[in-house]
Swiss-Prot record:
GO terms for biological process: glycine biosynthetic process from serine; tetrahydrofolate interconversion. Pfam families: SHMT. This is Serine hydroxymethyltransferase, mitochondrial. Disulfide bonds: none annotated. Pathway: One-carbon metabolism; tetrahydrofolate interconversion. NCBIfam families: PRK00011.1. Homotetramer. It comes from Candida albicans (Yeast).
Amino acid sequence: MLSSTLRRSVRAQSKNLPAFARRTYAVSPSAQALISKSVQDVDPEMADILNQERTRQKNSITLIPSENFTSKAVMDLLGSEMQNKYSEGYPGERYYGGNEIIDKAEALCQKRALEAFGLDPSQWGVNVQPLSGAPANLYAYSAILEVGDRIMGLDLPHGGHLSHGYQTKTTKISYISKYFQTMPYRLNEETGIIDYDTLEKNAQLFRPKVIVAGASAYSRVIDYKRMRQLSIRLGAYLLSDMAHISGLVSAVVTDSPFPYSDIVTTTTHKSLRGPRGAMIFFRKGIRKVTTKGKEIPYELERKINFLVFPGHQGGPHNHTISALAVALKQCTEPEYVKYQQEVVSNAKHFADALVSKGFKLVSDGTDTHLILVDLRSRNIDGARVEAVLERANIAANKNTVPGDVSALFPSGLRVGTPAMTTRGFGPEEFDKVAEFIDQAVNIAIELKAQEQGKVPKELLASFKKLADESDKVKQLDKEVVSWVSKYPVPGEL
């Protein structure tokens, strides 16, 4: 301890110092505590919710094809100091100072994005600032279309995505269909494969300026070459949305859209296993040569970059871009390629296991990471089966199948293999998952016979109440949790 004489000497000297020099800390201890303590100390309520979600993920079988478990290294960047900086603009062209390091991170992310997909930087560029997939598609459309121009994309009930311009007979569901004229193409309902012949006939009449090749619930490889040939005949752009399959494309375990596309968009958190973000890849160089020999260049880089910022977004999320750079580096590792190979092989095995249980699959199988189960032959729907699965800690999602008329009770169940392959599942594990799904379907059929109500919403509410109280559902839940909790999640080992 300081002697009283020394303490008096220190106080006397401090009186001669300016106010800022007499303070021990730049902020008070209480203010310092507010910004330095853990979430457990600052907000126990939110910390408890976080722990609940961690436990749910650990104790659940995650089959939703658009979900995955990202790596600890990616998570480290998502919660890092990179999120503190504001950086409107692009590397070397920011509207704020102090972005020298941020520029390095974004430039590295762009470089790795091209490397991850084997792209020549003289022929392709990439914007890594879009916040998610649907906005990325809007930015890309806006760069090459005027309001009222025409788009063709896969119909949502046939496996497409909302952001491809979905509308019904009475309602423009996606605002894309308000900004632009949209016309869907569909599957052949007998085969479950895209009906390319009808697509070509309709496109010749509709004359779209953009054809979208991509899906959210289509399990087969898309014929990009044929769609490219069609787009050339129409003078249209081919925009490929590979959000679901980008991880597979990076690992070269499925066909790549890049050789045939003008623009490629993707999310970054699905099979790619990165943070929640998006990218827009765009062609450079010469787009076409006229009959008189005049070269017409692509102008996509300038237009797309402008439509991202300042056209639609302000400051980018630097923590996400930095985390994405890490994920893209991981894409080039041999273990990542092996993982994607297992995602596809597991999906094929899972599909076979479901067929062996008597399930009908749309297109009779899969080439990718996802499977679409048609439940009509079991006289049950995806909504009720999803409800039983959810209460048994199995996450899957109801989905429309070709021919569906009810949005509340679609006939399909969409499942996939990326997340559980990350946790170490192989063929034997997916055999067991198929057994769990079969049990859940049988339970759903029994509960449906007991439900009460006059209108669809009442019937579904009654069904869910029965599922909450069902001893069979509780027993299935117990089996699932006991089994799946033994498999680690990233960062646990």
